[in-house]
Amino acid sequence: MGTFTLHQGQSNLIKSFFRNYYLNAELGLPNDMELREFALQPFGSDMYIRHLSFSSSEELRDYLVNRNLPLHLFYSSARYQLPSARDMEEKAWMGSDLLFDIDADHICKLRSIRFCPVCGNAITSEKCERDNVETLEYVEMTSECIKRGLEEARNLVEILEDDFGLKPKVYFSGNRGFHVQVDCYGDCALLDSDERKEIAEYVMGVGVPSYPGGSESAPGWVGRKNRGINGVTIDGQVTIDVKRLIRIPNSLHGKSGLIVKEVTNLDDFEFNEALSPFTGYTIFLPYISIETEVLSRNIKLNRGVPIKIESSIGIYLHLKNLGEVKAYVR
């Protein structure tokens, strides 16, 4: 089977955008970064590079810019005595933060299209027989779906603050949802998988009874149930995992080119071009003809017809498989 290699961040131009970003990016690193495992997926590979350890932001930056430019960049929720050890037992787990993952595509039904990047035809299989290449998939992420994910994050924050007395931070994942993180120390950090599962099930509303006739303003689940909140839609496996990798705040998501960004005020969050660090314009060559919503804008593309468009949009379209960024225009 032929392999089509110019999509998903493989072009040198996209790499240059990412490298220039990481030259000056102020990554959101934990104060105890020397206790964390770092990992990344480099450009041009499906494999992750793991078991990395850094003691300063400068050391990390030098590695990213000069040795392994990341398409995706992570650190561990766990703290380890030896984070660079390749054997998980040798790392010596010291506790971990508490994580929650909200994927908007688990909440909404999104439009999905699979197509051949050569002929542009819609194809349901993973291969185009005519051109002997692998097909690509595009999933449209809408602002309405992101809003629904944000509402789930809002409900989760309320539960963690009011019912557990925790101080969660909310991050836009950089692509299709939100991460909610509690920096844990002491007993919180030492919660095992079973205890974290209980917390996950609690916020999902598993086993929580109905309270008919209760007041909407009542505290806890009584008020939530009577406001129509039956639970928060999270990926429970993320919460249970005590050795999970976290996307580094202010890193770039390799499937969108958007920043993994802390949301300090949920009321002010907007799914738009401001989430991209890229300025200027690009020349974008579409693989297919399509009208689609992109970062809260309606975009019309015609197959094979180059379009001059903001770099934030062009890079997003490229990483979403809809075509190629061919040039940068200042």
Swiss-Prot record:
E.C. numbers: 2.7.7.-
Q: Say yes or no: keyword Glycoprotein present.
A: no
Any one GO molecular function term: metal ion binding
- The answer to keyword Disulfide bond applying to this record is no
Judging by the UniProt lineage, the source's domain of life is Archaea
InterPro entries from the UniProt entry: DNA_primase_S, DNA_primase_ssu_euk/arc, DNA_primase_ssu_PriS
What does the record give as cofactor?
Answer: Mg(2+); Mn(2+)
> Sorted alphabetically, which CDD domains does this protein's record hold?
AE_Prim_S
The active site annotation covers: 101, 103, 235
Q: Which UniProt keywords apply?
A: DNA replication, DNA-directed RNA polymerase, Magnesium, Manganese, Metal-binding, Nucleotidyltransferase, Primosome, Transcription, Transferase, Zinc
**Pfam families, from UniProt?**
DNA_primase_S, PriS_C
Give the top-level enzyme category: transferase
List of residues binding Zn(2+): 116, 119, 128, 131
Question: From its record, what is one biological process in GO terms?
Answer: DNA replication, synthesis of primer
Q: Which GO terms describe its cellular component?
A: DNA-directed RNA polymerase complex; primosome complex
Annotated PANTHER family: DNA PRIMASE SMALL SUBUNIT
* Family designation: Belongs to the eukaryotic-type primase small subunit family.
Q: How does it assemble?
A: Heterodimer of a small subunit (PriS) and a large subunit (PriL).
The protein's job, in short, is: Catalytic subunit of DNA primase, an RNA polymerase that catalyzes the synthesis of short RNA molecules used as primers for DNA polymerase during DNA replication. The small subunit contains the primase catalytic core and has DNA synthesis activity on its own. Binding to the large subunit stabilizes and modulates the activity, increasing the rate of DNA synthesis while decreasing the length of the DNA fragments, and conferring RNA synthesis capability. The DNA polymerase activity may enable DNA primase to also catalyze primer extension after primer synthesis. May also play a role in DNA repair.
Identification of the protein by name: DNA primase small subunit PriS
Gene name as annotated = priS
